[in-house]
């Protein structure tokens, strides 16, 4: 029962990790279904069911895999350790913000089971999501699921902000705090500011569907484009919410593996804050095709390109950290290097898409799918694997099998590239997103992509095997490498005590 009412940040972080990993398996299964459908021409199921799977895949991966693992799992576990706090600021609220997630997930699963399921895409645009096109309760259940997940995130965000601002050890100033803690801080501010807008938009959609209002119905003087503006005002900060903790983890692991402080720490902090602020003023680049004014499109093109500058600062700072260092090529370092390379590639396709004139042609094609999967599937997910490999000894006191972990990286690296690189070609050839069938001219790249997807499932299974093997063989961490400069290793015994590091303070030299 202690897991149900535990208020210890380590227990709650572990719960988040387990929940996120489990949902990650569900999301991976859904993605395999998508790729099996597209692996051959002809259809396995009908178009609506295909769209239900696509929608569920997106929601599960974003709200129930990446966010719980990165912010809930690594955030809860590491932030108190890194700032020298005994626990989070509001431990019971922390417990509640986790236990809101399983009901949210159950609601999402139920939404695909009632009527025909919610086949709207993750953006839930009206009029497709209106009562006219989706008459059953499925979209309503999906909306309630999002409400619960959003409440969970907002409670967690308040908790992290108060913890980081008020519970640092004496002498632990904000300049000394790890970049991972900074990334969580920026992320939770984004969550706190953007989620209420999403909640407003989907509540308006709920009343449109059930109470005959017409916020998004032109027949009653509403405008479906209003929904798009509200949704993307949340949706764009959301993609930075997914990647910023990854940035922090990469900086943290890189600093430890290169045995020195990350290059340009202050610049890194300012870059993250800039990305956070700019993320709020570029939302309409998702809507270049809705008939906006040319001046508006020019502004959003320029603003989107400016985000590339702080992102570039981060990439070059990572490269400068590696440059001239004696890097320890551990499994977590492999993931970090893979992250830097593939995230940069995804960023380059993002620059292409930020041009409104090009985006008119590429909008809703597989080029966009390839872009955001390079950033998420090889950015966020690679960062999660890097963090898991790096912090596994802190969380369990055991060590993973190093050679197997490296082999798993190689398999995964080949698999995800094989899955998503061909999709750039499909997009340039004009294959649209969210369709379950396609002309035979697209067959070759789709088949290659589906083989890659199958291979990535094997990579995930290999990961499960590695974790299982680590618990089975019980290789304890005997001593901590003296070159690991960061706070969470300083206790010297793992996992750390129930309330560790209560009496530690920092001396200015």
Curated annotation (Swiss-Prot):
Its cofactor is heme; Cu cation. Pfam families: COX1. It is a multi-pass membrane protein. Belongs to the heme-copper respiratory oxidase family. This is Cytochrome c oxidase subunit 1. InterPro entries: Cyt_c_oxase-like_su1_dom, Cyt_c_oxase-like_su1_sf, Cyt_C_Oxase_1, Cyt_c_Oxase_su1_BS, Cyt_c_oxase_su1_dom. There is a cross-link at residues 236-240 (1'-histidyl-3'-tyrosine (His-Tyr)). Its EC number is 7.1.1.9. Component of the cytochrome c oxidase, the last enzyme in the mitochondrial electron transport chain which drives oxidative phosphorylation. The respiratory chain contains 3 multisubunit complexes succinate dehydrogenase (complex II, CII), ubiquinol-cytochrome c oxidoreductase (cytochrome b-c1 complex, complex III, CIII) and cytochrome c oxidase (complex IV, CIV), that cooperate to transfer electrons derived from NADH and succinate to molecular oxygen, creating an electrochemical gradient over the inner membrane that drives transmembrane transport and the ATP synthase. It comes from Albinaria caerulea. It is an enzyme of class 7 (translocase). SUPFAM superfamilies: Cytochrome c oxidase subunit I-like. The gene is COI. It is found in: Mitochondrion inner membrane. Heme a3 binds at residue 371. Fe(II)-heme a binds at residues 57, 373.
């Amino acid at each position: 029962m202690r897991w149900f009412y535990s208020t210890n940040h380590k227990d709650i972080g572990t719960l988040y990790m387990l929940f996120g990993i489990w949902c990650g398996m569900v999301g991976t299964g859904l993605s395999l279904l998508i790729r099996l459908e597209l692996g051959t021409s002809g259809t396995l199921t009908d178009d609506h069911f295909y769209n239900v799977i696509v929608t569920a895949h997106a929601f599960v991966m974003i709200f129930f895999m990446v966010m719980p693992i990165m912010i809930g799992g690594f955030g809860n576990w590491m932030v108190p350790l890194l700032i020298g706090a005994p626990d989070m600021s509001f431990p019971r609220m922390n417990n509640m913000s986790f236990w809101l997630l399983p009901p949210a997930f159950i609601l999402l699963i139920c939404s695909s089971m009632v009527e025909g399921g919610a086949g709207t895409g993750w953006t839930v645009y009206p009029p497709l999501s209106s009562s006219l096109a989706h008459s059953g309760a499925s979209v309503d259940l999906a909306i309630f699921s999002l409400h619960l997940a959003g409440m969970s995130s907002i409670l967690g965000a308040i908790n992290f902000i108060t913890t980081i601002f008020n519970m640092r050890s004496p002498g632990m100033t904000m300049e000394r705090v790890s970049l991972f803690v900074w990334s969580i801080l920026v992320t939770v501010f984004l969550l706190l500011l953007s989620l209420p807008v999403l909640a407003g938009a989907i509540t308006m959609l709920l009343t449109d569907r059930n109470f005959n209002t017409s916020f998004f119905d032109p027949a009653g003087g509403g405008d479906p484009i209003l929904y798009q503006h509200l949704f993307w005002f949340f949706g764009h900060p959301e993609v930075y919410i997914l990647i910023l903790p990854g940035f922090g983890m990469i900086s943290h692991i890189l600093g430890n593996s290169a045995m020195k402080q990350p290059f340009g720490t202050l610049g890194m902090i300012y870059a993250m804050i800039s990305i956070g602020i700019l993320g709020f003023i570029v939302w309409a680049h998702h809507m270049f095709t809705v008939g906006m004014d040319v001046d508006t499109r020019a502004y959003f093109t320029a603003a989107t390109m400016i985000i590339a500058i702080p992102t570039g600062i981060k990439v070059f700072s990572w490269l400068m950290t590696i440059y001239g260092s004696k890097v320890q090529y551990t499994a977590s370092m492999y993931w970090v290097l893979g992250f830097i390379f593939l995230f940069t590639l995804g960023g380059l396709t993002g620059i292409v898409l930020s041009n409104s004139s090009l985006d008119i042609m590429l909008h809703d094609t597989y080029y966009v799918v390839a872009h955001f999967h390079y950033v998420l599937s090889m950015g966020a997910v690679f960062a999660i694997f890097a963090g898991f490999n790096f912090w596994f000894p802190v969380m369990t006191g055991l060590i993973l099998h190093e050679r197997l972990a490296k082999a798993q990286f190689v398999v995964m690296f080949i698999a995800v590239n094989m899955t998503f690189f061909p999709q750039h070609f499909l997009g340039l050839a004009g294959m649209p997103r969210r369709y379950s069938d396609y002309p035979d001219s697209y067959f070759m790249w789709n088949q290659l992509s589906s083989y890659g997807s199958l291979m990535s499932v094997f990579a995930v299974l290999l990961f499960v095997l590695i974790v299982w093997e680590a618990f089975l063989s019980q290789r304890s961490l005997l001593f901590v490498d003296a070159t690991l400069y960061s706070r969470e290793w300083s206790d010297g015994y793992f996992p750390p005590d129930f309330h560790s590091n209560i009496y530690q303070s920092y001396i200015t030299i």
